[in-house]
């Protein structure tokens, strides 16, 4: 089974021979190596590039352990370049090499090498590295399979695919297993033995239990506003552990750098400013989140919200969570100031969308809850509610768009309805 990653492959084609280092980033096992060594290499060969002019090095493999030494790697690449024709270097998991930025900068000075690297940690895209590359690094962010990519490779109908995706997520390897137990064991195993191990080793953490518990807390609270103080209090009350705010904040940063989670800032829509406290955290793959909790906490609304968030990132949007303050009457008829939440404030260029995610909108109370946030937003940008199911999009009398998850996920331009 060959899974298509057409959008990412197209980016590589466009950026080919542009004189910059193409840096492919994303969580481990999301398909970066497959994109580079299979799909892009196939494209190069079909374009007439000779096989001996494609240099492939996977630094996470034991067979290339020696090449993790920067000088040896640079020398090896130099020796492979035997003529003046264009060579294509495909370098996988570059963070395994110390001082890799020096090697890449040296390769930039060789005019007939076009360089492509992958990495599973965002630290190597820090401002220091960007300065080292002097504006000659070109990032392509890769995500686990979108639902559209998953569905295209899935052997079954939409309902079965959606159920699978909500439980086991979109890591490509999951599609290779036919037995549910295998999928679950695979996800639980790589979470502990790949992702957590990487975070612990890369950041030289001594207390593995702390990071383990932190991940469990974040997995239990996807879509819920939180902050280091709240998490610290949870550690004290439930575990009897003193875990400082600063340490928690650092550990969350490590998880973000490893692409395991993303954080969504809170934006005050009326005040037009960011609110520092109570961010929301989402997992880069819901299957990993579910595996971390042993598939116990199956909360469809929060899982749907996580999937919508990831889909928006895949489409290239900037995504925040919104709050809007307004005056409203309470149950006693008194007017009080109330804070309404908007699941996502979505921006791209001059475009903005407000999005609510609801598993069920059949009750009048639920409709009121979702629509009241929109009613208090003082602008005319599009307001969309994404609901579970296959409902085709329609616009109600207030101008709000309601669309089913199927339409949202399978139509790349669904926000333009």
Predicted regions and their residues:
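Conserved glycine(s) of the Walker
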Residues: 31
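Hydrophobic positions on the alpha1 helix immediately C-terminal to the Walker A/P-loop
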Residues: 35, 39
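A cross-kingdom feature that marks ATP-driven nucleic-acid transaction machinery
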Residues: 2, 19, 25, 34, ...
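Interdomain hinge/linker elements that couple catalytic modules in large macromolecular machines
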Residues: 2, 148-325
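Structural recognition of the conserved hydrophobic beta-strand(s) that form the central parallel beta-sheet
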Residues: 114-120, 141
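Short glycine-rich substrate-engagement loop in P-loop NTPases that contacts/grips substrate
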Residues: 55-84
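Short regulatory helix/loop adjacent to the ATP-binding pocket of P-loop NTPases
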Residues: 123-138, 153-155
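Pre-Walker A adenine-sensing motif
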Residues: 2-19
């Amino acid at each position: 089974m060959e899974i298509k990653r057409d959008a990412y492959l197209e980016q590589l084609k466009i950026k080919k021979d542009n004189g910059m280092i193409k840096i492919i980033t994303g969580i481990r096992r999301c398909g970066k190596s497959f994109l580079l060594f299979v799909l892009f290499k196939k494209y190069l060969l079909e374009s007439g590039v000779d096989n001996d002019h494609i240099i492939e090095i996977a630094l996470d493999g034991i067979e290339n352990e020696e090449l993790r030494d920067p000088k040896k790697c640079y020398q090896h690449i130099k020796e492979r370049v035997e003529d003046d024709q264009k060579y294509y270097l495909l370098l996988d998991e570059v963070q395994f090499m110390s001082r890799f930025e020096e090697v890449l900068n040296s390769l930039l000075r060789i005019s007939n090498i076009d360089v492509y690297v992958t990495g599973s940690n965002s630290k190597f895209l820090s401002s220091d590295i960007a300065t080292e590359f002097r504006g000659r690094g070109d990032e392509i962010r890769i995500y686990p399979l979108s639902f559209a990519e998953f569905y295209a490779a899935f052997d079954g109908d939409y309902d079965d695919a959606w159920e699978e995706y909500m439980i086991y997520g979109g890591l490509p390897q999951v599609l290779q297993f036919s037995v549910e137990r295998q999928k679950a064991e695979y996800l639980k195993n790589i979470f502990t033995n790949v992702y957590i191990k990487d975070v612990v080793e890369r950041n030289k953490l001594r207390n593995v239990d702390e990071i383990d518990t932190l991940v469990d807390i974040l997995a239990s609270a996807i879509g819920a506003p939180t902050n280091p103080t709240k998490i610290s209090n949870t550690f004290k009350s439930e575990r009897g552990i003193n875990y400082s705010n600063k340490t928690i904040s650092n550990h969350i940063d490590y998880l973000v750098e490893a692409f395991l989670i993303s954080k969504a800032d809170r934006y005050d829509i009326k005040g037009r400013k960011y609110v520092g406290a109570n961010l929301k955290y989402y997992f880069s793959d819901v299957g990993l989140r579910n595996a971390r909790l042993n598939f116990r906490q199956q909360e469809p609304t929060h899982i749907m919200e996580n999937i919508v968030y990831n889909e928006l990132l895949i489409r290239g949007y900037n995504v925040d969570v919104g709050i809007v303050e307004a005056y409203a009457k309470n149950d006693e008829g008194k007017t009080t100031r109330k804070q309404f939440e908007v699941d996502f404030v979505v921006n791209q260029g001059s475009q903005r969308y407000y999005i609510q995610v609801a598993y069920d909108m059949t009750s009048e109370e639920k409709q009121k809850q979702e629509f009241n946030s929109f009613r208090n937003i003082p602008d005319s940008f599009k307001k969309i509610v994404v609901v579970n199911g296959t409902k085709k999009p329609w616009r109600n009398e207030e101008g709000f768009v309601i669309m089913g998850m199927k339409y949202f996920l399978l139509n790349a331009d669904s926000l333009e309805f």
